[in-house]
């Protein structure tokens, strides 16, 4: 299948809409998940969600930082939205895949949103972790 992303930058949100030409992926590969956890972060097992087409995890640290990982098989008209009012967006890459990085700085608290598509799977990582750790987490997902 061919997956096409349309990014729309609206006044208060950034919207990602996918269209699919062909038969979309219907299940995640077996054991598909992140394989790197930054030092000081712990998986919140109570919030973990996993089924055949999605996995969601959140991690927290002792100093109250948190980040979320969401990976979902893309179907036609899949939509995801993000804050655009306080976020600066730029193009980047994750494992040679085009990606979009959002940086939010509110009163000195910096957080990131990193989104990309690979092999019919939508990936997003949101939260308060270093930029280096953000990319290490992203590159570990398989």
Predicted regions mapped to residue ranges:
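Membrane-interface helical sensory segment of bacterial ECF anti-sigma factor regulators
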Residues: 1-17
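Surface-exposed amphipathic alpha-helical segments
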Residues: 119, 125-142
